[in-house]
């Protein structure tokens, strides 16, 4: 069996950010490039950190008092970035990269060739390959989905939902009506729809900025889930019982759940 390498799955090019960029600039770059993270390079063009949409959201720029808001507006990418940057050689086996990401809870790796950054490999890249493979074992969504997820009512404010996400570490929250029917999903990227990161009034509800829920049958295959994520550019899907589609979702399956499955010793990715 031919070994799939990182170079076979990665996407070339790196969206860069300067250490002194403001959080407003970071948010603008994330939105313009439709990415979840930016790599930060110093003056010598060496990677020194990474900042994500979740980092921006976790910053208390959502604070209601003017003093906190002023502090956050003065903060830079350097102050919120994570370091050091996790990197991988371009000719590393893709299975090894997937295992490393799963074990370390890493969503992306900076790809280097001859010590120079040439691209990025992320969970989405593995999903694209999974969706295209017909040799995958047919595990079901219900086998690997997460039973726990963050949920809020349709009357919840954006600021309250964002703080709950920041405090709990969840990247999104499922919005439901009084009966538990899923109405949408609110994520960190939805926050970027607010221009110039102005203070968000407490009167703005999650229903005003959430995106429509993407749902899948609990008996669907992982390949079907991966294809759905790729087609809709989503990182997570609500898992439902089709006979009770208007009830509270059974769980959530994320792109990271799929990569974790790839890292299992008996996965086709770990063979050959």
Where on the chain are the PLM-derived regions?
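Tandem CBS (Bateman) regulatory domains
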Residues: 1-13, 52-85, 98, 122-150, ...
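The conserved cystathionine-beta-synthase
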Residues: 16-35, 41, 87-105, 112, ...
């Amino acid at each position: 069996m031919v070994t799939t390498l990182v170079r076979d799955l990665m996407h070339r090019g790196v969206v860069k950010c300067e250490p002194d960029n403001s959080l407003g600039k970071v948010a603008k770059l994330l939105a313009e490039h439709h990415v979840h993270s930016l790599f930060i390079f110093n003056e010598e063009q060496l990677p020194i950190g990474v900042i994500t949409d979740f980092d921006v959201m976790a910053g208390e720029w959502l604070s209601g008092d003017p003093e906190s808001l002023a502090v956050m507006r003065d903060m830079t990418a350097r102050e919120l970035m994570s370091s050091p940057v996790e990197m991988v050689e371009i000719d590393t086996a893709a299975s090894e990269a997937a295992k490393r990401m799963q074990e370390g809870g890493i969503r992306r790796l900076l790809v280097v060739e001859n010590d120079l950054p040439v691209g990025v490999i992320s969970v989405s890249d593995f999903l694209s390959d999974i969706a295209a493979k017909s040799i995958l074992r047919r595990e079901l969504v219900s086998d690997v989905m997460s039973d726990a997820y963050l949920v809020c009512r349709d009357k919840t404010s954006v600021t309250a939902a964002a703080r709950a996400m920041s405090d709990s570490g969840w990247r999104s929250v499922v919005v439901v009506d009084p009966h538990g029917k899923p109405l949408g999903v609110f994520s960190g990227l939805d926050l970027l729809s607010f221009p110039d990161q102005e203070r968000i009034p407490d009167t703005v509800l999650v229903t005003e900025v959430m995106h429509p829920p993407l749902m899948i049958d609990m008996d669907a295959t992982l390949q079907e889930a991966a294809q759905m994520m790729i087609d809709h550019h989503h990182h997570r899907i609500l898992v439902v019982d089709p006979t009770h589609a208007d009830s509270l979702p059974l769980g959530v399956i994320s792109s990271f759940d799929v990569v974790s499955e790839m890292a299992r010793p008996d996965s086709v990715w770990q063979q050959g």
